[in-house]
């Protein structure tokens, strides 16, 4: 099944299918017609010798340098090569694939001035699964993601490297095997390819998809912990949460009630104790607040995915060619910093639940869930690992968006650092998943002490799936492997491709 790009209607759900399920893309014919019409404007500007930034001038501080007609093609090639200054490890393939898709989508708005050939080449790369090797570091987030997108543009020219059929190869190797010819960029096309926010946005979309799945998983794992600690179910009563009024909080409480509806391990208020600690009692309030963050982030991503972030932009059949600043990544920088905080908090509260599962002063379970306390340490150091991860997250959660540094001889004197924010958000999500993996290992062990037969239908099913990944703790062993196995399972096999539907599990 192909997803049609229009420049206006792309959604996160469609990106999930494109990035994680390998679906292909096609261009809306009406949108392609707009691309062709806009291109005619650019060619007339070049033919008439008009002075228009980015078309017949240099770039950045060189915007006052007029480029002769015969040098326009050389200008495009020089731009791409000189701006390909990315450094560090490459983005995941899903991100570079996302960059191709988002760049094509923004061009289909018909205000960038590229030839339809350029859009078609981007789509060919997507559909043939030729993904540029794009270094993660080197972007200031304004003028957009210049360095990362230059590495994307290189491969269209037959330069640079790509991921192709499971290997990292020179771009020409993939082009030759697929029977594709590299393109030669013409006026405006180099700038149209690299002036935008598609690196931070593509990474942001992947981060959001993983964060959404992780947030659902956090509720299921927290529910297992509630059982392991014989938590008080009254705290999740609908009346409590409707009295506050936040929809996300109400929804979390509702899902946890559904998960635990037939559990024999939860207790009533006053049965064992009057109230639970905040890390149990306030799950809906805390997790619900993280869902508020996720909803905000999704909204901003879907706007940016369909945004014209090029410069200059061409309107009204060429009557207006305007230099603006839509390449500035501040909206995504803020959204990614917000995502970092919202996800880090899920790990913070999870680590506190881990402590309550392993600390003998806080429960009636064996110390550190050890089969032979003293002789065997059990889950003692797993809590250390979780504490380390949440502390690392606190450092990564420092906002990148409050930083700025001038560039291009002070012409570009304020930047967003949105790509740094987006990269750090993804790192935090990996850490959160590992903390939740530790909580799950501890919660499964606690459930065994309480009696698996007493678990709810949903948590019992989840327990058995988890036990297919890691065995019960009968003796001390290398727990690092267990943590990574659960984390890998949560990411790839449980609900990364489709969000957890609790009701379907009931």
From Swiss-Prot:
It holds the Pfam family Lyase_aromatic. Its EC number is 4.3.1.3. Contains an active site 4-methylidene-imidazol-5-one (MIO), which is formed autocatalytically by cyclization and dehydration of residues Ala-Ser-Gly. Coiled coil: none annotated. Transmembrane segments: none annotated. Keywords: Cytoplasm, Histidine metabolism, Lyase. It is found in: Cytoplasm. GO terms for molecular function: histidine ammonia-lyase activity. GO terms for biological process: L-histidine catabolic process to glutamate and formamide; L-histidine catabolic process to glutamate and formate. Pathway: Amino-acid degradation; L-histidine degradation into L-glutamate; N-formimidoyl-L-glutamate from L-histidine: step 1/3. The modification 2,3-didehydroalanine (Ser) is found at residue 143. It catalyses: L-histidine = trans-urocanate + NH4(+). There is a cross-link at residues 142-144 (5-imidazolinone (Ala-Gly)). GO terms for cellular component: cytoplasm. HAMAP family: His_ammonia_lyase (MF_00229). NCBIfam families: hutH, PRK09367.1. Belongs to the PAL/histidase family. This is Histidine ammonia-lyase. It comes from Bacillus cereus (strain B4264).
């Amino acid at each position: 099944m192909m997803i049609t790009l229009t420049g206006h209607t792309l959604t996160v759900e469609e990106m999930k299918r494109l990035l994680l399920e390998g679906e292909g893309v096609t261009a809306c014919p009406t949108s392609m017609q707009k691309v062709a019409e806009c291109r005619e404007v650019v060619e007339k500007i070049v033919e008439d010798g008009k002075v228009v930034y980015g078309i017949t001038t240099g770039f950045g501080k060189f915007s006052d340098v007029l480029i002769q007609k015969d040098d326009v093609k050389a200008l495009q090639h020089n731009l791409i090569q000189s701006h390909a200054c990315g450094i560090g490890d490459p983005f995941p393939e899903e991100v570079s694939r996302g960059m191709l898709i988002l760049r094509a989508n923004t061009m289909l708005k018909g205000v960038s001035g590229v030839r339809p050939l350029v859009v078609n080449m981007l789509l060919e790369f997507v559909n043939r699964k030729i993904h540029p090797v794009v270094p993660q570091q080197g972007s200031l987030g304004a003028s957009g993601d210049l360095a990362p997108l230059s590495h994307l543009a290189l491969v269209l020219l037959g330069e640079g490297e790509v991921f192709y059929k499971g290997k990292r190869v020179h771009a020409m190797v993939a082009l030759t095997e697929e029977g594709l010819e590299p393109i030669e960029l013409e006026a405006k096309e180099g700038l149209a390819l690299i002036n935008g926010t598609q690196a931070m946005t593509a990474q942001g979309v992947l981060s959001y998809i993983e964060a959404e799945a992780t947030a659902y998983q956090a509720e299921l794992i927290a529910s297992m912990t509630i059982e392991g600690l014989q938590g008080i179910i009254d705290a999740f009563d609908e009346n409590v949460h409707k009295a506050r009024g936040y929809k996300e909080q109400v929804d979390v409480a509702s899902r946890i009630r559904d998960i635990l509806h037939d559990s024999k391990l939860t207790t009533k208020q006053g049965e064992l104790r009057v109230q639970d600690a905040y890390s149990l009692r306030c799950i809906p309030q805390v997790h619900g607040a993280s869902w508020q963050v996720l909803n905000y982030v999704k909204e901003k991503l879907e706007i940016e995915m369909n945004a014209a972030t090029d410069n200059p932009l061409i309107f009204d059949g060429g009557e207006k060619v305007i230099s603006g600043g839509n390449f500035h990544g501040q909206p995504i920088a803020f959204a990614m910093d917000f995502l970092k905080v919202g996800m880090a908090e899920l790990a913070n509260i999870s680590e506190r639940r881990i402590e309550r599962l392993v600390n003998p002063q806080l429960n009636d379970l064996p110390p550190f869930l050890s089969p032979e306390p003293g002789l065997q340490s059990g889950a003692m150091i797993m809590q250390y690992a979780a504490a380390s991860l949440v502390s690392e997250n606190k450092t990564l959660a420092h906002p990148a968006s409050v930083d700025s540094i001038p560039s291009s001889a002070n012409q570009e004197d304020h930047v967003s650092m949105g790509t740094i924010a987006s990269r750090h958000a993804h790192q935090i999500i990996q850490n959160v998943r590992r903390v939740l993996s530790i909580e799950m290992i501890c919660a499964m062990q606690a459930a065994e002490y309480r009696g698996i037969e007493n678990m709810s239908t949903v948590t019992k099913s989840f327990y058995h799936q988890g036990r297919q990944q890691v065995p019960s703790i009968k003796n001390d062993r290398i727990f690092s492997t267990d943590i990574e196995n659960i984390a890998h399972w949560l990411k790839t096999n449980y609900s990364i491709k489709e969000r957890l539907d609790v009701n379907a599990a009931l």
